[in-house]
Amino acid sequence: WIAAHLAAASAYAADVVFGPVYPVYPEGTPDWVRAANPMFHDMGWSTPGKTVDFGQSGNTLIRADLVRRLDIRFDPEFGRSGGEDNDFFRRLARRGARLVVTDTAKAWENVPADRVRTGYLLQRMVRTGRIYANLALRGVHGPRRLAFAIDALLKLLVATGGAIAFLPIDRTRAFRLRMKASSNLGKLSALFGARPTAAWS
């Protein structure tokens, strides 16, 4: 695992390498939830070496000397809501760090039973959308902010309509669309001042 991370860092001259984290769902998880795979985040693993602007810290190699030199730290503002890793890597990328993905350094994570509930998963997507919007819209005003709002609204409407249409025939696809709708609802709520809710106490 670590050898795969180091090999990717060398091959792609990367400062940060992200690898996939595969969820291990608990017994009793419905088949349609497993098929929707809501806890898996695809960063383009099928394109190893792809450059990205942000990522998550679940399976990551970071060049420590770069972090020390740039003096970048996690922002405690995101300590309870989550998103501090997303913010951290965005700031690294803005300072010139090279962030890439690899599909060879794989990790697995056991998912607690209470995190495969529909209500939790949809609320998680709302929170994720708020975090994304709060980060993406920092310093953004005027037409670009309006364009972001219109984009989120259109995606919300399309995803909601799709979820309703697919529910009778494809529960997995319908749920994926519900998650997409929830994420865009979170983005819109952030535009009206909503802050990410605490993910833990």
Q: Where are the model-predicted features located?
A:
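Active-site phosphate/pyrophosphate-handling residues
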Residues: D65, D87, K106
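Non-catalytic, C-terminal membrane-associated alpha-helical segments of glycosyltransferases
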Residues: Q123-R130, L137, H141-S201
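Residues that recognize and position ribonucleotide moieties
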Residues: D53, T60, V100
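Active-site donor/metal-binding and catalytic loop motifs
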Residues: P76-R80, A97-G119, I131
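Short, flexible, basic/aromatic active-site loop/helix in glycosyltransferases
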Residues: G19-P20, R34-D53
